[in-house]
């Protein structure tokens, strides 16, 4: 199985939160946008600045994140991805989610691959389903 994962999936895994994706790592190949690295590291730093993480916890999370990044194919944010993210989608979608979805669309269009979209975000899951992606990870009315 080929997958595209968004930041919500990686953050739940890193933080060992309830509801983490059970199928973690059970894929042939995993893709994400280079945006993932920025979002994950910013989230860790923001949490640190709020006093919710010790220095040791930050170091552990960053080390685990880098290990995960090394196992992913991170896709460059190209002009065509930015252009597609700027266009309308069938359902409401925020900017960062639109960038993730546009990246997954570019992978499918350029490589003819069948991707499963991994997200815990129900709004992003709905948008991905509206574009015929198989979606895993989102619960509730998506």
Name every feature range the model reports, one short phrase each.
Residues 5, 32, 76, 95-98, ...:
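Short beta-strand scaffold positions
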Residues 26-30, 87-93:
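A short glycine/serine-rich beta->alpha loop
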Residues 10, 36, 81, 100, ...:
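Alpha-helix capping/helix-boundary segments
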Residues 51-77:
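Helix-adjacent hinge/juxtasegments
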Residues 67-91, 98-103:
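Acidic catalytic patch
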Residues 1-37, 47-59, 139-141:
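Short, well-structured N-terminal submotif of metal-dependent ribonuclease cores
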Residues 2, 33, 106-142:
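Acidic, PIN/NYN-like endoribonuclease modules and their adjacent C-terminal/linker elements
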């Amino acid at each position: 199985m080929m997958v595209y994962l968004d930041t919500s999936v990686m953050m739940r895994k890193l933080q060992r939160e309830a509801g983490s994706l059970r199928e973690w790592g059970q894929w042939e190949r995993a893709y994400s946008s280079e945006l993932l690295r920025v979002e994950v590291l910013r989230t860790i730093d923001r949490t640190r600045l709020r006093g919710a993480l010790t220095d040791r916890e930050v170091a552990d999370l960053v080390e685990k994140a880098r290990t995960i990044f090394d196992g992913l194919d991170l896709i460059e944010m190209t002009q065509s991805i930015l252009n597609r993210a700027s266009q309308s989608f069938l359902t409401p979608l925020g900017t960062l989610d639109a960038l993730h979805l546009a990246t997954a669309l570019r992978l499918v269009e350029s490589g003819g691959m069948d991707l499963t979209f991994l997200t815990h975000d129900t709004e992003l899951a709905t948008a991905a389903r509206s574009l015929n992606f198989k979606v895993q990870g989102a619960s509730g009315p998506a």
